From Swiss-Prot:
Gene3D superfamilies in the cross-refs: Winged helix-like DNA-binding domain superfamily/Winged helix DNA-binding domain
Tissue expression per record: Highly expressed in thymus and testis, but weakly in intestine and lung. Appears to be expressed only in adult organs containing proliferating/cycling cells or in response to growth factors.
Keyword Cytoplasm part of the UniProt annotation: no
Entry protein name: Forkhead box protein M1
Residue ranges: DNA binding: 234-326
Organism: Rattus norvegicus (Rat)
Biased composition range(s): Low complexity: 141-151
Length: 759
């Protein structure tokens, strides 16, 4: 990058004034400053000066012009063939004659063509000028001690280069004139015509001459001296490792001792010899030891150690290689590019161009010493989890099947789009309890009927939707084989559901099936509660939005149902996706019990996986504690304690002193209950075994509540509403066929204990 040939004038003014220490050099500098204005005089001044020159005994062809800006100063144009010594003598005499009023300073410029004057007359003229300078100062410059009229000879040069040559030619002869402050004409100077003097080169650099002109005019001796001075003041733009390579590769055998490396660097980079601190040698030794490319070899006698470059790492970098000229289009050296980036000083850059004498684009570009790898982005594809596919015919244990189903449901739930949260009543969806006896209540409440309908209506409502829901169908099929292994006295509703789903998948119109409505086995209920708890924990941890769910009420849990009977199809979908059917309790909000007009549900629907209502046992309600522990005499129906033994209370509802809870009736009518009980008496395989739920895990939270003794019967669910007008009718319709025990008669029932409101 070339330096701009012109700088702001303020910088030039600050830079040029120098202290009066070396009179000859300073005078030459000052006269160099004055010289450029010699091309700006008017024709009138030129003719006037010519007349003066003719009158002052000057040889023919000499032109004397007043300086445009400097007072009492004249510019003398000397032809190539003129005698410089005689002209200097005439100018000295003229200065003495004029005294303080006339011009006492003369600037000599050559007015001929190419410079052909030998250097010897120039040196003689300069010496004569120096000898006469004191005379001029003492004799002719009495009133002006600061002004010195010193004519300085110049080698003849081309006429268009008069200003440039004058700035160099007067370098040897004059002292500084403090009164000369206007140097605006310096910006118009150029350095085309230059002499062979090193001082001229210094002046050119200080006056911001073009780099190409420097390369053309500067010769080897001055170039060496100037580059030495510039490099001393500026640190070389090479690393220690690069300079070590330059030194080692400069030898024929490509090896060098440590002392020779020091010497080579000092010779080629005087900065380290004159300016740098001695610690740079430590850096050289450090780099020799640090980089593996430098290998230390010992001579045969073991006294001398040489440093070489490993052949595999040696790129044979030399200092000459950096500046070696090549054909156009060849790459440039990285060292030179690095030097251009690192050094802001234009003088050092000028030094490089002086040494090369070639344009910047003709230098070699080499591979970087330390190649770098450009960074880039690597695209990464995240795998998508595929849903687990289960064969419906595979029989797996219940916990494993439940875990597989819960993981699959969790994955399916993540793919479902999140819908806005709305009330269930708006969409006609009702959360269904998972207890089989409770499912009987769906058509009753939805249609506003008394609990006197057969259970077949439930099956038709559940099966009739007939819609294929693939991810819901699989979990039901997986669960169905373990259900068939239970020797239950009557077919459970869950088995019925699974069979109906399989039938609906085969035929477009599902067949409603009739079956006895009975409770599942206690062990089955316990395992389902464990599975439900495990599934809830997993889905809560996998949900994208952690929601703080309101904990279910511990005293009187409430479940609400919609009046619309068309809500059972979506409700089944929610039930199958949220949890496995488990015994739950439905507690109406009012004291009226389940036989009153149903209340519209107000539970919000959340698209995120949420906890379902925890499982409850059908005998979670409370009566006044009985006085004895034996079998209940006040129960209208005697039930076998093995099949319908006590079940665990998952929510602590069995504790004493709790408010009596109103529950959904377990059966459509006492007659149907008694029929199922009679069937159970004949075919119950668990009648002689202890309650199987006691064998469940003791650490599960569902089993921490102490189990009830045998003083609770499932028929405690027949808590009737005393405010209902149909109470007497329902009680009168109760008959007990097939049971001949006396305590089962309605006359022996203690209704004050059975219904607390009668007290």
């Amino acid at each position: 990058m070339r330096t701009s040939p012109r700088r702001p004038l303020i910088l030039k003014r600050r830079r040029l004034p120098l202290p009066i220490q070396n009179a000859p050099s300073e005078t030459s500098e000052e006269e160099a400053k004055r010289s450029p204005g010699q091309q700006e005089p008017t024709q009138a001044q030129a003719s006037q000066d010519v007349a003066e020159s003719s009158s002052c005994k000057f040889p023919a062809g000499i032109k004397i012009i007043n300086h445009p800006t400097v007072p009492n100063t004249q510019v003398v144009a000397i032809p190539n063939n003129a005698d410089i010594q005689s002209i200097i003598t005439a100018l000295t005499a003229k200065g003495k004659e004029s005294g303080s009023s006339g011009p006492n300073k003369f600037i000599l410029i050559s007015s001929g063509g190419a410079s052909s004057h030998p250097p010897d007359p120039q040196s003689q003229a300069q010496t004569s000028t120096d000898s006469k300078r004191t005379e001029l100062i003492t004799e002719t410059l009495g009133p002006k001690p600061g002004a010195k009229g010193v004519p300085v000879p110049k080698p003849p040069g081309a006429l268009p280069r008069q200003r440039q040559e004058s700035c160099g030619g007067e370098a040897a002869g004059c002292t500084l004139d403090n009164s000369l402050t206007n140097i605006q004409w310096l910006g118009k100077m150029s350095s085309d015509g230059l002499g062979r003097c090193s001082i001229k080169q210094e002046l050119e650099e200080k006056e911001n001459c073009h780099l190409e002109q420097n390369r053309v005019k500067v010769e080897a001796p001055s170039r060496a001296s100037v580059s030495w001075q510039d490099s001393v003041s500026e640190r070389p733009p090479y690393s220690y490792m690069a300079m070590i390579q330059f030194a080692i590769n400069s030898t024929e055998r490509k090896r060098m001792t440590l002392k020779d490396i020091y010497t080579w660097i000092e010779d080629h980079f005087p900065y380290f010899k004159h300016i740098a601190k001695p610690g740079w040698k430590n850096s050289i030794r450090h780099n020799l030891s640090l980089h593996d490319m430098f290998v230390r070899e010992t001579s045969a006698n073991g006294k001398v150690s040489f440093w070489t470059i490993h052949p595999s790492a040696n790129r044979y970098l030399t200092l000459d290689q950096v500046f070696k000229p090549l054909e156009p289009g060849s790459p440039q050296s990285p060292e030179h590019l690095e030097s251009q980036q690192k050094r802001p000083n234009p003088e050092l850059r000028r030094n490089v161009t002086i040494k090369t004498e070639l344009p910047l684009g003709a230098r070699r570009k080499m591979k970087p010493l330390l190649p770098r790898v450009s960074s880039y982005l690597v695209p990464i594809q995240f795998p998508v989890n595929q849903s687990l596919v289960l064969q419906p015919s595979v029989k797996v244990p219940l916990p494993l099947a439940a875990s597989l189903m819960s993981s699959e449901l969790a994955r399916h739930s993540k793919r479902v789009r999140i819908a806005p949260k709305v009330l269930l009543s708006n969409e006609g969806i009702a959360p269904l309890p998972a207890t089989e006896p409770m499912k009987e209540e769906k058509p009753l409440l939805g249609e506003g009927l008394l609990p006197l309908l057969p259970i077949q209506s439930i099956k038709e409502e559940v099966i009739q939707p007939g819609e294929d829901i693939p991810h819901l169908e699989r979990p039901i099929k997986v669960e169905s084989p373990p259900l068939e292994e239970w020797p239950s006295p009557c077919a459970s509703v869950k088995e019925e559901l699974s069979n109906s789903w399989e039938d609906s998948s085969c035929s477009p119109t599902p067949k409603p099936k009739k079956s006895y409505c009975g409770l599942k086995s206690p062990t089955r209920c316990v395992s389902e509660m464990l599975v439900t708890k495990r599934r809830e924990k997993r889905e809560v941890s996998r949900s994208r939005r952690k929601q703080h769910l309101q904990p279910p009420c511990l005293d009187e849990p409430e479940l609400f149902f919609s009046e619309d009977s068309s809500t059972f199809r979506p409700a089944m979908e929610i039930l199958a996706e949220s949890s496995e059917p488990a015994p739950q309790l439905s507690c109406p909000q009012e004291e009226g019990g389940p036989f009153k007009t149903p209340i519209k549900e107000t539970l919000p629907v959340s698209s995120t996986p949420s906890k379902s209502v925890l499982s409850r046992d059908p005998e979670s309600w409370r009566l006044t504690p009985p006085a004895k522990v034996g079998g209940l005499d006040f129960s209208p129906v005697r039930t076998p304690q093995g099949a319908f033994g006590p079940l665990p209370d998952s929510l602590g509802l069995m504790e004493l002193n709790t408010t009596p809870l109103k529950s959904v009736p377990l059966f459509d009518s006492p007659r149907e209950l008694l029929n199922s009980e009679a069937f159970d008496l004949a075919s119950d395989p668990f009648s002689s075994s202890p309650p199987p739920h006691l064998e469940a895990k003791p650490g599960s939270p569902e089993l921490q509540v102490p189990s009830l003794s045998a003083n609770r019967s499932l028929t405690e669910g027949l808590v009737l509403d005393t405010m209902n007008d149909s109470l007497s009718k329902i009680l009168l319709d109760i008959s007990f066929p097939g049971l001949e025990e006396d305590p089962l008669g309605p006359d022996n029932i203690n209704w004050s204990q059975f219904i607390p409101e009668l007290r």
